[in-house]
């Protein structure tokens, strides 16, 4: 049963796997802090729209096709957010820069430690490649061995500036499968291939932590109203 909560919106640009985690949790009724949830897609026909339908989440397309359209996109986004009294925005695979909106908390999920592997240009496979490159350097310097344990992180944080450096809502370590490290170190797979495997592995943890981070962020908003 849903209690009085806030209105939230998820912004996605692609397949929406992270968005699906939040929408699925909302559908089964465990997102108690949310009174309403909407999906905002930046692309017509994006896979996230079908996932919204499957979860019975209302959706809208506010299209943005090129960097020069970003200012107008943000103007239209702000108008939609205000018209629907959205107080929390979850960035879940949005490829465009989102401008701050007054009285709206924005959160993002990052597949690593935001301080070491965050900032502008650090997204997608680039993050995992950097994590793995640093691990290879540690092995090269004989500080650790390929068979040792290594970890990365999943971080849910508030959106702010500098990029990816907003207050952390939750952060958790994720153990990197040993076979990825060993295969990369032996040259069996390339850095790109290793990063793709690590990305797939970490994604499953993102699906756990993004709904939890969304609830924590919504609770923060509700607590301020008391």
Where are the predicted features?
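One-carbon transfer enzymes
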Residues: 1-226
């Amino acid at each position: 049963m849903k209690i009085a909560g806030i209105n939230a919106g998820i912004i996605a640009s692609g397949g929406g796997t992270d968005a699906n985690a939040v929408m699925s949790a909302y559908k089964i009724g465990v997102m108690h802090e949310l009174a309403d949830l909407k999906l905002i897609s930046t692309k017509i026909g994006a896979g996230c729209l079908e996932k919204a339908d499957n979860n019975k989440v209302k959706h809208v397309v506010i299209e943005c096709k090129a960097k020069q359209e970003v200012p107008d996109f943000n103007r239209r986004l702000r108008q939609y957010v205000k018209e629907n009294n959205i107080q929390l925005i979850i960035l879940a695979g949005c490829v465009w820069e989102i401008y701050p909106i007054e009285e709206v908390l924005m959160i993002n999920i990052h597949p690593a430690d935001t301080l070491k592997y965050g900032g502008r240009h650090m997204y997608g496979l680039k993050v995992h490649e950097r994590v793995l490159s640093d691990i290879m350097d540690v092995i090269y310097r004989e500080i650790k061995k390929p068979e040792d344990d290594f970890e990365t992180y999943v971080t849910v944080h508030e959106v702010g500036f500098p990029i990816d450096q907003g207050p952390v809502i939750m952060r958790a370590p994720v153990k990197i499968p040993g076979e990825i490290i060993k295969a990369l170190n032996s040259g069996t797979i390339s850095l790109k291939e290793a990063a793709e495997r690590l990305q797939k592995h970490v994604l499953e943890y993102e699906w756990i932590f993004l709904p939890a981070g969304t609830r924590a962020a919504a609770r923060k908003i509700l607590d301020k109203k008391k």
